[in-house]
């Protein structure tokens, strides 16, 4: 029973510290220094406990298996948490040629700020709709665009910061 608890401790510790590492890296990229440092402190403290437990029992391959399993699961959980948290802002470009004025109106009615640029593509004139939004609202953007123009081309990029312009909250 004691050995099983040891494996579980190693697994859970590694799962936790790797998940935290994923979130910490996102905070680093987004310039959230203090939050990243705090997460890093807790993360490395947990890591030291896990690696200490493994190194003290290197003769037991199940310790290594628990460590590796916790690492792999921690990556999965970290990515899952990051997707659910949907932190930060993004910029979406919607390229369409189908009743663009109506699409712009729909997007604005939902609460998105939209800037329209005329462009020229392989098939002629296209309109590029630049939309800055919070990541948590991306599915709403996709849904609104899809309802209007199933053939619209949408690209999304991360935005480190957004300043000025129209950046309203979503309407119900």
Swiss-Prot record:
Protein name (record)? UPF0316 protein Clos_0555
Keywords on this record? Cell membrane, Membrane, Transmembrane, Transmembrane helix
How does this protein sit in the membrane?
Answer: Multi-pass membrane protein
Q: Which family does it belong to?
A: Belongs to the UPF0316 family.
Q: What is the lineage of its organism?
A: Bacteria, Bacillati, Bacillota, Clostridia, Peptostreptococcales
Q: Where in the cell is it found?
A: Cell membrane
Q: Which organism is it from?
A: Alkaliphilus oremlandii (strain OhILAs) (Clostridium oremlandii (strain OhILAs))
Gene Ontology cellular-component terms for this entry are: plasma membrane
* Keyword Membrane recorded: yes
């Amino acid at each position: 029973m004691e050995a099983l608890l040891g494996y579980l401790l190693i697994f859970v510790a590694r799962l936790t510290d790797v998940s935290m590492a994923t979130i910490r890296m996102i905070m680093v990229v987004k310039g959230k220094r203090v939050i990243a440092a705090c997460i890093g402190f807790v993360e490395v403290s947990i890591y030291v406990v896990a690696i200490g437990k493994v190194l003290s029992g290197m003769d037991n391959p199940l310790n290594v298996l628990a460590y590796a399993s916790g690492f792999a699961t921690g990556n999965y959980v970290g990515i899952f948490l990051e997707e659910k948290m949907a932190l930060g802002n993004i910029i979406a470009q919607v390229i369409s040629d189908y009743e663009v004025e109506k699409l712009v109106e729909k997007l604005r009615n939902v609460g998105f700020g939209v800037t329209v640029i005329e462009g020229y593509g392989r098939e002629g004139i296209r309109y590029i709709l630049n939309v800055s939004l919070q990541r948590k609202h991306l599915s709403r953007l996709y849904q609104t665009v899809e309802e209007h123009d199933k053939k619209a081309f949408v690209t999304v990029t991360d935005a480190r910061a957004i300043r000025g312009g129209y950046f309203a909250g979503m309407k119900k």
